[in-house]
């Protein structure tokens, strides 16, 4: 089994989970800063946004998890709510918080919210792909017991042997799904005559929503509300929002193309 602690710095334990999250964050920031000028967004605005959004997203991810596991946390010492290294960060809580921060931040900077979402979506997708490996090392976000995992490398099989049985590596399914989504976004961005403002955001919503809805049904650690898997309902909502956004943006006569600002700059140069 892989030790969840990567190394120690004095009394502080640096966990693989944190390394995975930070690695995804750094890559997401790099990608967004690289794309920002094409949307006439200052790269420094990306840094300013992350400094606000990232800590709040962690808080949101934790509060979301605690809220839906209140039957457990209500019986624990209050300090347990703040001990995130025991597990319990829900990605949907982080996404919702991050989206709210992005909306208000973009308005305060007079940036079109869809433009900001479009440049953020690819980085979020790949960051989620990397972050799932933190779940792997923590032995969480897995599925039901299976007879064998012989089709996987030894290190994954060994880590997925939990409570006396091999488990469906749902973390791997979602990580792979998000990686494919990221690659497809890069391909879509090469189609300037087709892509419109908001299309990348819509693709993210639909792609992630579809994958998460299916994979969530395989997991054994889902959060429930009134007997229903919360993440599946939210996934369905993402899909609906994505479809509505595509239809709305493509029916609007004045919706700019994704690269309109870039092409205009080239013509005026």
Curated annotation (Swiss-Prot):
Membrane topology: Multi-pass membrane protein
Cysteines engaged in disulfide bonds, as pairs: none
Uppermost EC category: transferase
Presence of the UniProt keyword Transferase in the record: yes
Any one GO cellular component localisation term in the record: plasma membrane
Subcellular locations according to the entry: Cell membrane
Highest taxon listed in the record's lineage: Bacteria
Gene Ontology biological process terms, A to Z: lipoprotein biosynthetic process
Pfam families xrefs: LGT
Pathway this chain belongs to: Protein modification; lipoprotein biosynthesis (diacylglyceryl transfer)
Residues spanning the membrane: 9-29, 46-66, 81-101, 110-130, 168-188, 198-218, 227-247
GO MF assignments: phosphatidylglycerol-prolipoprotein diacylglyceryl transferase activity
Sorted UniProt keywords: Cell membrane, Membrane, Transferase, Transmembrane, Transmembrane helix
Assigned EC number: 2.5.1.145
Main location, first listed in the record: membrane
Keyword flag Transferase: yes
UniProt cross-references to InterPro entries, sorted A to Z: Lgt
Residues holding a 1,2-diacyl-sn-glycero-3-phospho-(1'-sn-glycerol): 132
Known function: Catalyzes the transfer of the diacylglyceryl group from phosphatidylglycerol to the sulfhydryl group of the N-terminal cysteine of a prolipoprotein, the first step in the formation of mature lipoproteins.
Family in the record: Belongs to the Lgt family.
Protein's name according to its UniProt entry: Phosphatidylglycerol--prolipoprotein diacylglyceryl transferase
